[in-house]
Amino acid sequence: EYTLKGSMQVKAEKDGKPVAKPLEVDGEPVEAEATFTPEKSDGTANVAFRFNSRDIKPGTELVVFESLERGGNQLAAHEDIEDVNQTVTVTAPAISTSARDGIDGDKDVVVDDEATVIDTVEYKNLVPGKEYTLNGKLHSKSTGEPLKVGGKPVTGQTTFTPEKADGKVEVTFT
């Protein structure tokens, strides 16, 4: 039986050279380990790191350092701050939108008791399988103020669970 122990490192620079700085979340280093029994002399094993990345600046590069142990003795280590195969980049979710008339799809909404605007929201860097809610509010382009009907803002909301990190979803305003 073998144990893989890993630590997450922040790739930084000192004097123009890349250096490793241990990643800490809530004052604790981000570490993980996995125990496995190999079926062959060569193979792979996964080590899953779970941590809150909300406070990590987008664009930050994180590098995994790992050691292989058996019976408490270190047999091998991989600690290369420049290894692209051990590097991930923190990304932030992003959205862009495109609104259209809900009746005929053009950019003109006819004055009507039941006007509808559909906003197609293109999203990037979401977590597949996690539920998200998009909330929208129509604004007057000329004033920048929220559009109100009967004294209430015109809003739309859609809850969805993406299958992929990037995609599109629609929010309907009525």
What are these regions (language model features)?
Residues 1-174:
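Solvent-exposed loop/turn and edge beta-strand elements of beta-rich ligand-binding domains
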